[in-house]
A protein has these predicted regions:
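Conserved small-residue-rich
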Residues: 50, 55, 64, 226-265
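Vicinal oxygen chelate
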Residues: 2-45, 47-59, 79, 90-92, 99, 113-154, 171-175, 230-241, ...
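Amphipathic alpha-helical segments
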Residues: 59-75, 148-150, 241-258, 340-348
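Hydrophobic, helix-prone linear segments
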Residues: 1, 21, 28, 34-111
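ER-lumen resident redox/N-glycosylation machinery signature
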Residues: 38, 80-81, 105-126, 176-177, ...
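Long, well-ordered mid-to-C-terminal structural blocks that present hydrophobic/aromatic surfaces
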Residues: 256-315, 320-322
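Extended low-polarity, hydrophobic cluster-rich segments
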Residues: 68-69, 131-134, 181-183, 250
Length: 415
């Protein structure tokens, strides 16, 4: 994960991408924040993403294991049984982040994460279901925690983590006021496996194992298992006024750098990207994408501009919107691999929000699935061609954003 050269990592002076203009505040504080992070040693001590944490409603985790086993490279590993949650560990390998899939046992259970859901109409429809955040690798958890607390970042106490059935060998921040996600820190020797403790009795649940095996058999039958790669990026949506603060906050808590922002005027939004400062592929530590409106919803009636991002946030609250996975470059069955994968999954009844957008000439093709009825998360597939290094084209992201906005509008009408 790290080596002695990490102490010399530099987070500033890296190439900037995009055409979005930021405020003077952002451009002033960005280099100051990154330089201070490098200078105090946090950049060197904080590594990539070790795990993602997702919670679902009582009785729904087995079905979500099936969904993820079919649509992603993840494998069911074990289940940890704690007083208020079942936590299923899903893993590709030790070179990609785990997924901690948590199922609440009691539908009447309340905690801080349910309270965040209850504030928003769509979030309240699934009161327990939400993406919690990421766990990051650190070389010295105690020192990182001390430095971050000195910088006024707040963390759950070990007793609070135990009460929440979250691993106490991980230091976890309080939910962000800008994204409502958390960031955790876990210390682990690079040559050891990830362990989350003490989360109760560890076992392989027969129902989970059976469901997982059937989904993987179907994935193999559809001939798509070797085409779907690890996570490429994680995309969060927030309010327009919080865009720059959300970026600076994540940069302060991680060892990522600001890759750049693109203005998407057709959708009244921007797409903003942060990447690991280490020269590692996104499969090892996914990029973080933040999307926000250019103008807040309170002036939409004046200009009549589209507002799919702000509408999503108004309905669900600031949160993760989609998980993007890479698709291996190439062709199968006379189709580009991404088209082959999408057609195969669609044949099993899984919906997609639009046709695959982009082209080989443009450098990449992308598509959004329909939102999961269990987690509300969208799966994005991305196939890059040749040496294309970006995460989207402006035309692609405009069409994807519009399609997601149409789906959210239809869901709202049905309620």
């Amino acid at each position: 994960m790290t080596n002695p050269s990490d102490a010399k990592l530099k987070s500033t002076g890296l190439p900037r991408n995009g055409d979005k203009l930021n405020s003077d505040f952002f451009e002033t504080y960005l280099p100051r924040l990154l330089e201070e992070r490098d200078r105090c040693g946090l950049t060197g001590m904080i590594g990539g993403i070790e795990a993602l944490m997702i919670t679902v409603e009582p009785g729904n985790s087995i079905e979500y294991i099936a969904e993820l086993a079919l649509m992603t490279p993840y494998h069911y590993l074990v289940t940890l049984d704690s007083p208020r949650h079942l936590t299923h560990i899903l893993r590709i390998d030790m070179n990609s982040p785990d997924i901690l899939l948590r199922e609440v046992k009691d539908p009447d259970y309340h905690d801080i994460f349910r309270n965040l859901n209850d504030l928003h109409p769509s979030g309240a429809q699934r009161p327990h279901s939400r993406y919690l955040g990421e766990i990051l690798w650190v070389s010295n958890r105690e020192q990182v925690l001390e430095l971050q607390q000195a910088r006024e970042f707040r963390f759950f106490s070990p007793d609070a983590l135990a009460e929440l059935d979250l691993p106490t060998n991980v230091s976890i921040s309080k939910p962000s006021p800008y994204t409502q996600n958390v960031v955790g820190y876990m210390e682990r020797h690079p040559n050891t496996v990830r362990v989350y403790h003490p989360l109760g009795n560890c076992s392989i649940l027969p129902q989970a194992q059976d469901t997982y095996e059937k989904a993987k058999e179907l994935q193999k039958k559809l001939d798509i298992g070797d085409l779907i790669g690890p996570i490429d990026h994680l995309a969060t949506r927030g309010y327009s006024q919080n865009r720059e603060a959300a970026l600076l906050e994540y940069l302060a808590l991680s060892s990522y750098y600001y890759w750049g922002s693109y203005n998407i005027p057709d959708q009244n939004s921007s797409t903003n990207v942060c990447k690991s400062v280490r020269p590692v592929p996104e499969s090892v530590s996914p990029a973080k994408v933040f999307t926000a409106n250019n103008l807040p919803y309170c002036v939409n009636h004046l200009d009549g501009l589209p507002s799919p991002t702000e509408t999503f946030v108004s309905n669900f609250g600031p949160r993760l919107h989609h998980i993007a996975l890479t698709v291996k470059d190439g062709e199968r069955g006379g189709k580009e691999n991404i088209d082959f994968v999408v057609d195969a999954i669609a044949s099993q009844g899984k919906g997609f929000l639009l046709e695959v957008v982009g082209s080989r000439d443009a450098g990449l093709k992308q598509i959004f699935s329909a939102a999961s009825p269990i987690s509300a998360l969208i799966i994005e597939y991305v196939q890059r061609f040749g040496n294309f290094q970006g995460f989207f084209t402006k035309d692609n992201v405009a069409r994807l954003t519009a399609a997601a906005g149409v789906e959210e509008s239809l869901v709202k009408i049905k309620r």
